Amino acid sequence: MSWVQATLLARGLCRAWGGTCGAALTGTSISQVPRRLPRGLHCSAAAHSSEQSLVPSPPEPRQRPTKALVPFEDLFGQAPGGERDKASFLQTVQKFAEHSVRKRGHIDFIYLALRKMREYGVERDLAVYNQLLNIFPKEVFRPRNIIQRIFVHYPRQQECGIAVLEQMENHGVMPNKETEFLLIQIFGRKSYPMLKLVRLKLWFPRFMNVNPFPVPRDLPQDPVELAMFGLRHMEPDLSARVTIYQVPLPKDSTGAADPPQPHIVGIQSPDQQAALARHNPARPVFVEGPFSLWLRNKCVYYHILRADLLPPEEREVEETPEEWNLYYPMQLDLEYVRSGWDNYEFDINEVEEGPVFAMCMAGAHDQATMAKWIQGLQETNPTLAQIPVVFRLAGSTRELQTSSAGLEEPPLPEDHQEEDDNLQRQQQGQS
């Protein structure tokens, strides 16, 4: 017998003797102990099952009972009378504070409250944002040592605080001293929400009045007044005149069979009126639109009455006298020595367009409504009756050329509006 076989035989006998001694110590009968034969050289490893292995299997982890989430949606739906205003929103925040004394689930509640603020109309109220920040537990998320200051301490809570400040930034809400005190009390001075607050206080005063054409925060709800404001906002000439060609009728005065009467509001300056009077009647004018104009969170649409650009040989160049020219009051012909590398031209991409004679905003964008606008323009522009008018509306599939005498035509069907928009844009791009 070789020394390898002797070693394996001794190892098998030791295992069998260990199992017998263990059974005797635990009180198990020897007959119940499985017999372990010595393993030889040619013995297969499949004979030893996993149940007879000496290595114990790891215990299975306990399954914790799943806790039901707090129905925060129900808190927002418990307002008396179903009213959605600032009082009901603050009452919901107070109910959450009373419901959860330990502030469990406050992160999910704050995210849900940020999404619900637009429905309650409090997205621009600073006091409501301060109440949401007041939900955070105090003196808990502040870093205590240098290690916590280096790394992001409680990152999920800090991201939630930054989300509140970002929504304030998107709606133009300037934080005050109370907001700063709450953030210091919750996250400390050396935190990312506090850094976001410092940036808001730095850049908000600089960009608050940067727009040279400011739009008021509260826009008029009446469509006629909103159209008048939008036209005044686009027209640079202060002497332009706004005309209301048609006022929408109330729903009570119109019957079920009567067609709706949309509003039509137009604007035209004296210079545009004079340019239209000098226009060649042989060349048509175009009604194009609708084009979008955003006034804060409201989008209005307008149409323009324009003409094509005249060819260079037909243009009349108006020479400005030297004493009237504010940019170059004197003409100096000085011959300075210039090298061949000097560039006399500036790289400015200027696109020349045709003149715009008038603009309007209407409640409908069909041809019949635009025809009524053209008829209203004929009262102050008599030459428009002899000029052909071509309608290039986004909702039409073809250009309809009509004379000013027979402008009243039935509106076009509104089927396949998206396909018509694409086709009309392609036609305008080719023209």
From Swiss-Prot:
Cross-link Glycyl lysine isopeptide (Lys-Gly) (interchain with G-Cter in ubiquitin), sequence positions: 372
Transit peptide: 1-48
Main location (coarse class): cytoplasm
DNA-binding found in the keyword field: no
Gene Ontology biological-process annotations: cell surface receptor protein serine/threonine kinase signaling pathway; innate immune response; mitochondrial respiratory chain complex I assembly; regulation of oxidoreductase activity; regulation of protein complex stability; toll-like receptor 4 signaling pathway
GO molecular function, one term: molecular adaptor activity
Keyword Nucleotide-binding: no
GO CC entries: cytoplasm; cytosol; mitochondrial inner membrane; mitochondrion; nucleoplasm; nucleus
Superkingdom as given in the UniProt entry: Eukaryota
Transmembrane stretches, start-end: none
Region (Disordered): 400-431
SMART domains in the cross-refs: ECSIT_Cterm
Compartment list: Cytoplasm; Nucleus; Mitochondrion
PTM characteristics: Ubiquitinated on Lys-372; leading to translocation in the nucleus together with RELA and NFKB1 and expression of NF-kappa-B-dependent genes.
Key words, A-Z: Cytoplasm, Immunity, Innate immunity, Isopeptide bond, Mitochondrion, Nucleus, Transit peptide, Ubl conjugation
Subunit structure: Interacts with MAP3K1, SMAD4 and TRAF6. Interacts with SMAD1 only after BMP4-treatment. Part of the mitochondrial complex I assembly/MCIA complex that comprises at least the core subunits TMEM126B, NDUFAF1, ECSIT and ACAD9 and complement subunits such as COA1 and TMEM186. Interacts with NDUFAF1. Interacts with ACAD9. Interacts with TRIM59. Interacts with TMEM70 and TMEM242. Interacts (when ubiquitinated) with NF-kappa-B subunits RELA and NFKB1. Interacts with RIGI, IFIT1 and MAVS; these interactions promote RLR-mediated type I IFN induction.
The protein's role, per its UniProt record: Adapter protein that plays a role in different signaling pathways including TLRs and IL-1 pathways or innate antiviral induction signaling. Plays a role in the activation of NF-kappa-B by forming a signal complex with TRAF6 and TAK1/MAP3K7 to activate TAK1/MAP3K7 leading to activation of IKKs. Once ubiquitinated, interacts with the dissociated RELA and NFKB1 proteins and translocates to the nucleus where it induces NF-kappa-B-dependent gene expression.
Family according to the record: Belongs to the ECSIT family.
Protein's UniProt name: Evolutionarily conserved signaling intermediate in Toll pathway, mitochondrial
Lineage, uppermost ranks: Eukaryota, Metazoa, Chordata, Craniata, Vertebrata
Name of encoding gene: ECSIT
